[in-house]
Structure formats: C-alpha cells, structure tokens
Swiss-Prot record:
HAMAP family: UPF0297. Signal peptide: none annotated. This is UPF0297 protein Ccel_2240. Belongs to the UPF0297 family. InterPro entries: IreB. PANTHER family: UPF0297 PROTEIN YRZL.
Length: 88
C-alpha cells in the first residue's frame, strides 16, 4: 500500500459491545476508588501502562481484554454520534 492510499480499520460489532461494557465497568471501579476516571483512562489509552487502572473489581484485567485502539474507537464513535449535528 502506497503513502497516498488510505488503509481501512474495522472492529466487529461484538468487540464494539464489549468495549462499551469494559469502559463503563472500568469507569465505575475507578470512580468508586476515588480516582478521576477520565484522567486515569486517558493515561492508560495513551501510554498502554495498566497501572493507571485500579485492580479494584478486577478493572485492570478487564480493561486489558481489548486493545487500546478498540477502546479509543468506541470513545470516538460515541462522541461523534452524540455531538455531530450533520446527518450521516
């Protein structure tokens, strides 16, 4: 594939649903432990360092079930679907 071609990136629906469940579960565990869940999750997604995620409620193991790019895709998709005023 040349530099002037666009690569396609795709995640199947099953992984999409799993990503939603993981994000909600990890967010709740971080919140219950008194962390800022958004900051911690951004730290994990950007760095790949699982120590940004608490072990409480097995959240660290749960978040590692999917690749970080799959989690990020779900975040972007949700944001754009809910904040895009243009019709698709």
């Amino acid at each position: 594939m040349g530099i002037n071609e666009t690569m396609m990136f795709k995640v199947d629906n099953e992984k999409e649903n799993e990503a939603k469940e993981i994000l909600v579960s990890v967010h709740q565990a971080l919140k219950e432990k008194g962390y800022n869940p958004i900051n911690q999750m951004v730290g994990y997604i950007l760095s790949g360092d699982p120590t940004y995620i608490t072990n409480y409620k097995n959240a660290r193991s749960i978040v590692r079930r999917l690749e970080r790019d799959e989690l990020l895709e779900e975040v972007l998709k949700f944001y754009l679907e809910n904040h895009n005023n243009e019709p698709e």
